[in-house]
């Protein structure tokens, strides 16, 4: 009998806790996020704590990670975007490691839950909002009114631009969640289908699963990269009011 492919996304309490009537249990999702946070921190510490002129493998990897993200920030936002680099690097590491660790059997993919990805998107959204108002004051609201728009069209354009601005965290989070859920469901279905086959027919599906795992690992990193690219684009809009 084929197992439910959605069961891998169930949030399960590991340490049940309640306080003042609220459920604050430590779940498999929380454990996965804590593990990823520690892993990301250790990765950066190992890479840069004893930096040398001739880099080790870990230092070389850390430098590639650093340079790729700082170039991404500079190319999209510009020199003023340097202030956002820690946020962008943190998002990339957290999402990519979360996606990759979710590929491990019995591990939990927390990026498959909209509440997690939406929270990450809201961090970006709040940053753009606060920074935009701090930097441009009332001029920030000109973002919702494109230049050279006829006066009679202005109210409609303001409403449209406002809706687009508000919908950004929704689209950002849904894109990541949908890709993670779809990929993991496909792998689960194919893996369980192999179990029901006779030994003679198993080599081909197993080879297919190996290829799909490699592809899913690529997608895991790609989705983290896309998330950070779009975050940079949203931040650029408030930096330059474009």
Curated annotation (Swiss-Prot):
Transmembrane ranges, per UniProt, are 29-49, 83-103, 114-134, 140-160, 181-201, 206-226
Q: Where in the cell is it found?
A: Cell inner membrane
What are the record's GO terms for cellular component?
plasma membrane; proton-transporting ATP synthase complex
UniProt entry keywords in alphabetical sequence: ATP synthesis, Cell inner membrane, Cell membrane, CF(0), Hydrogen ion transport, Ion transport, Membrane, Transmembrane, Transmembrane helix, Transport
Task: Kindly list the GO molecular function terms attached to this UniProt entry.
Answer: proton-transporting ATP synthase activity, rotational mechanism
Where is this protein chiefly located? membrane
Please report any disulfide bonds recorded for this protein chain, giving both cysteine positions: none
Answer whether the UniProt record assigns the keyword Ion transport to this protein. Answer: yes
- What's the protein's topology in the membrane? Multi-pass membrane protein
Q: Which Pfam families match?
A: ATP-synt_A
Q: What does this protein do?
A: Key component of the proton channel; it plays a direct role in the translocation of protons across the membrane.
Q: How does it assemble?
A: F-type ATPases have 2 components, CF(1) - the catalytic core - and CF(0) - the membrane proton channel. CF(1) has five subunits: alpha(3), beta(3), gamma(1), delta(1), epsilon(1). CF(0) has three main subunits: a(1), b(2) and c(9-12). The alpha and beta chains form an alternating ring which encloses part of the gamma chain. CF(1) is attached to CF(0) by a central stalk formed by the gamma and epsilon chains, while a peripheral stalk is formed by the delta and b chains.
Give the family from UniProt: Belongs to the ATPase A chain family.
Which PANTHER family does this chain map to?
ATP SYNTHASE SUBUNIT A
State what protein this is by name: ATP synthase subunit a
- Organism of provenance: Orientia tsutsugamushi (strain Boryong)
Give the gene that encodes this protein.
Answer: atpB
């Amino acid at each position: 009998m084929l197992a439910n492919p959605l069961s891998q996304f169930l949030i399960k309490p590991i340490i049940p806790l309640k306080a003042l009537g609220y459920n604050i249990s430590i779940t498999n999702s929380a454990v996965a996020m804590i593990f990823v946070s520690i892993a990301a921190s250790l990765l950066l510490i190992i890479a840069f704590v004893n930096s040398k002129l001739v880099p080790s493998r870990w230092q070389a990897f850390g430098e590639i990670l650093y340079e790729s993200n700082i170039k991404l920030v500079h190319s999209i936002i510009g020199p003023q975007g340097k202030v956002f680099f820690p946020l962008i690097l943190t998002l990339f590491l957290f999402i990519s490691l979360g996606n990759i660790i979710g590929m491990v059997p019995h591990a939990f993919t927390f990026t498959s839950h909209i509440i997690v990805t939406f929270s990450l998107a809201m961090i970006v959204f709040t940053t753009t909002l606060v920074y935009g108002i701090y930097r441009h004051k009332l001029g920030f609201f000109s973002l919702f009114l494109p230049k050279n728009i006829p006066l009679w069209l202005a109210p409609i354009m303001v409403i449209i631009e406002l809706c687009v601005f508000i919908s950004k965290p929704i689209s950002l989070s849904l894109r990541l969640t949908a890709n993670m859920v779809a990929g993991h469901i496909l792998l689960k279905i194919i893996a369980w289908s192999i179990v029901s086959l006779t030994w003679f027919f198993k080599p081909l599906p197993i080879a297919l699963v190996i290829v799909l795992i490699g592809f899913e690992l690529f997608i895991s990193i790609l989705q983290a990269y896309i998330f950070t690219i779009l975050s940079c684009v949203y931040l650029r809009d408030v930096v330059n009011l474009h």
